């Protein structure tokens, strides 16, 4: 009888050990932010000579990014990139 109880306990423990990593992984993905959610940057290129000339004149020497949500500290909004992104450039 003792052997049966011990064997059952070991089997239950083995199942619990296998189930815990799956639960932890699910919980981590729910609570953690998606990688770079706030730091998503999108590269933008302007087509044609006129677009690139205007872009170079107004933003010469600046490194600007399309960010989701809000700009980082030290940056300001210079426009939008599509519907959900802000065009953020360093303050001058």
From Swiss-Prot:
The cysteines joined by S-S bonds are 64-89, 66-81, 71-88
A single Gene Ontology CC annotation of this entry is: extracellular space
Residues covered by region (Disordered): 23-42
Q: Where in the body, by tissue, does this protein show up?
A: Paneth cells of the small bowel.
Q: Which InterPro entries match?
A: Alpha-defensin, Alpha-defensin_N, Beta/alpha-defensin_C
Q: Does the keyword Membrane apply?
A: no
Keywords (alphabetical) are:
Antibiotic, Antimicrobial, Cytoplasmic vesicle, Defensin, Disulfide bond, Secreted, Signal
- Tell me a Gene Ontology molecular-function term this record carries: phospholipid binding
Where does the signal peptide begin and end? 1-19
Question: Where does it reside?
Answer: Secreted; Cytoplasmic vesicle, Secretory vesicle
Extract one GO BP annotation from the record. Answer: defense response to bacterium
**Chain residues in the propeptide:** 20-58
Family stated for the protein in its record: Belongs to the alpha-defensin family.
Q: What does this protein do?
A: Host-defense peptide that has antimicrobial activity. Exhibits activity against Gram-negative E.coli (in vitro). Probably contributes to the antimicrobial barrier function of the small bowel mucosa.
Identification of the protein by name: Defensin alpha 4
Q: Which organism is it from?
A: Mus musculus
| Top-level taxonomy | Eukaryota, Metazoa, Chordata, Craniata, Vertebrata
Q: Which gene is this protein's source?
A: Defa4
